[in-house]
């Protein structure tokens, strides 16, 4: 089958995200996604908890967005944490030892801890479309160039921190709806990135709700389900 997956989503287990597990599932279904990778910043806790407890036909792929010394790296199919602050090579090696797949995420986006030229052939894939990246077109073009140069598979994810943004970028994967099968297909290049930038209005609404949450102390997501 062909799986449609957003491979880069943050939940409330990331300090800068507003996405609750309930809203993650709601918007994943609304966007027609079969699978979502939860990639919280430097923690696997939420991804494992949600994957275990979610009663949904949307497959949860446990992952992490790791802060390496040289930029951010998405690890997919993880069951244990990855140390932050290591070099790119050390981080990728640790991901591989844990049985995960290492993705060079938003390698040329501004203000995102991007890897730039630290992306290497040690990675399993490059995130060529990141729907939250700025400037979007330049980010995609530069990421496509590095993926071609390194001869690596290309994937896409939203990098969503606000539930209505989920699914603006996604990856078609030629695999059964199974986590192990999906990540193996990605590493083998049986995948196709698709998507568009998150609209400015959603980015502004995210910041409005984020700062409102900080002021009021509310921990609930303010996303409107429309």
Model-found features: residue ranges?
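Short beta-strand/loop segments at the ligand-binding rim of alpha/beta enzyme cores
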Residues: 2, 95-103
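Aromatic-lined carbohydrate-recognition surfaces of secreted/lumenal glycan-active proteins
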Residues: 103-111
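Charged catalytic cores and adjacent phosphate/nucleic-acid-binding surfaces used
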Residues: 1-11, 15-17, 21-26, 45-49, ...
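Active-site rim/loop-helix segments in enzyme catalytic domains that contact anionic ligands
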Residues: 52
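Divalent metal-dependent hydrolysis catalytic cores, especially in the metallo-beta-lactamase
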Residues: 24-42, 101-103
